[in-house]
Amino acid sequence: MSHSVKIYDTCIGCTQCVRACPTDVLEMIPWDGCKAKQIASAPRTEDCVGCKRCESACPTDFLSVRVYLGAETTRSMGLAY
């Protein structure tokens, strides 16, 4: 099952989400929009198992994981923005 991992603009570049992900979905990429000059990116969303460890690890509630269950209603697993 594939999950969509949404990355928005409150990332502080701490890498907590990357280290917390058990399936190596996330990685840090260069980005000038924050003090750390890097931001979390999710290039391998097909490997996401929806465990939300990245969300739990994030100190700024930056990440949102949404699970798409085929024809069923989309269920948000993310935190409010």
From Swiss-Prot:
Domain 4Fe-4S ferredoxin-type per the UniProt entry, residue ranges: 2-31, 39-68
EC numbers: 1.97.1.12
Pfam families the UniProt entry points to: Fer4_21
Bilayer disposition of the protein: Peripheral membrane protein
Disulfide bonds: none
The protein's assembly and partners: The eukaryotic PSI reaction center is composed of at least 11 subunits.
Name listed for the protein in its UniProt record: Photosystem I iron-sulfur center
Species the sequence originates in: Cuscuta gronovii
